[in-house]
Amino acid sequence: MSSRSGSADTFTQRSDSNLRPRRLISLDDVRDNNGRQPSSSGISTTGSSELPTLRSRGATPSPRPSRNVSPIPMGHPSRATQPRSDARPGNSLGGFTPNGKYQDPFTESSRAAVDFLDASWSSLQGIASSLLGSDTARPTSNGGPRSHARKPSRPDYLAKHRAVSTSTWGPSGPTTPEIGAGTQDERQAMVHAKKMEALLLADTDPSWNLNSRHKRRDSNDRTVQSRADTDQDEEALVYVHQVQPTDTITGVTIRYGCQAAIFRKVNGFWPSDSIQARKTVLLPVDCCSIKGRPVKAREETDLLQDVPSRPSIEDPSGSSIVPAPSPEKSTFSRISEQPGTEPEAESDQIWKHESWVQIDGFAEPVEIGRVPRRALGFFPRTRRKSVSYSDSEPVRGRLQTPTISTASSPIQPSSSPNADQHDSYHAGSPASRGPGSKPKGRHRRRPSGLELSGTGVGTLDRNVNLPGPAMDGLSKFFAQHLPTLAPKQAPPNFDSLSGNSSTVASINSTSLDSIGGAVEGWVRKITARAKSSINDLQQGTSSSQNQAMPPETRRRGFSDLIELEDGVESRNSSGLLAGTGWKPDLTRSGSGYVNGANLRERFPSASPSTSRTRTGLDRTKGD
């Protein structure tokens, strides 16, 4: 080994002295320099298949570095990848190279380390290329584009083919980025246009959204409304229950198996109402748990069929006069005997008779009626019979003669014993509120049997007896030429009741207002008479009082005049008028002229001298 290295050194010195000044650049050197990688990469690869593992590191320092040669542009870049025929396996490890360079031989340990580092670096580079993608033309250290592209590893190749194959099928995505493109105003305008387009293209048929609340409907909803009205117009079956005196809402609902809430809704009961206020109540058949068996009524028998098949109406016991009573017949006859009976006081009969059924636990058959379904779910009622009025309505239970009730003469003729019954018939009248309530002529409701006649509404005079216009000249003229428009005359017995309204009110009126007015008038009359009597008495007795007074008192004069308060009883005034010889006693301390509880000054004193004089007089009286 040492002999080899020594011969190499002598040969190198000889070649340097002989060949170095005459060194020429051959085409092989140019080809080698163009195909060699730059030193920055640190790795140079060869395309020959004969050298799969032999590589030289450009970073390894050479003991005899040569002068750098300026690169020559490649005319044929593809030649860099062509295999070289003159490459030899031993050139990279030492000895002479084709370009005349001498390389120091590596030891076996150095060669193994270089091979290990090359393998590790190539593996790391393959992993990095697979993650970052294939190598593209990168700029080299001298600024030119990289001509040699490394062959991609297998994972990168597979990933590239997979990506290419994935993009060849399926729907193509948007070619231009549309998210956040344009200004904010343009995006808002686009959103508004999209919403308007969706609104115009939407389905306007409301049949898909029947349960939603529409605030505005158009002509397209007519079909839906007609369909809903058809459903509401369908008839439902109900049990018609005749209310008994012992029935309660809870008992009836338990007996029929119906919920109390449904029962109250169908019949229009408030929570505080009682079932006794009705004569008939309805219970929906589909909401009740009990079912009945149909019963054939006697009225439904065909009268045109043969006589032998007709059921016998004779008593089986032998009586041919009185037919045998049956529960069905008794029930039907009882109901048919009352054709004019109103089922409810508040409203008319809303059901139509359908059939009769026999229910277990019921002594008599139960009637089944048919009512519109909208009547079962509407509450409260829209109209009551008590407030409805009709001119052709017959008056039941009272006379046709109208009853007169006015403020000036509240006396009513008691021509019928049913008048009190009629007053108690109305639920709203004060007479029916309690057993001890007193009748009030002023606030009593006018009976509905009073017919209005004539033109106009009448005058506001307190002496009006009947509704209608007053009997003036115009009314008399129309009464002569148009008898139908003439106002009706007062009843014959009304003349005897006319007279002084105050006298009638003071004698026969039971109204509190009339009594109060009469008492007030009487008190005013008595007070006025008492005042006049006192004034006359004071003027007549002034001379006698002056004579009885002492001289100094007479000189001062009696300037303090007094009068009695309002409301003095008549007996006091009569006593004052009867006593002609009465003189005031000024010597007593309890005189009526100085009593502050019952007297008041008519002319109050304006000077302190007068008050001082009155004080001295009082002191004299007290002594």
Swiss-Prot record:
This is Uncharacterized protein AN12072. Residues 25-34 have a biased composition (Basic and acidic residues). The lineage of its organism: Eukaryota, Fungi, Dikarya, Ascomycota, Pezizomycotina. InterPro entries: LYSM1-4, LysM_dom_sf. Residues 1-107, 132-181, 207-231, 298-349, 384-464, 533-553, 568-623 are annotated as: Disordered. Residues 39-49, 165-177, 400-417, 604-614 have a biased composition (Low complexity). Residues 1-18, 132-144, 328-339, 533-548 have a biased composition (Polar residues). It comes from Emericella nidulans (strain FGSC A4 / ATCC 38163 / CBS 112.46 / NRRL 194 / M139). It comes from the Eukaryota.
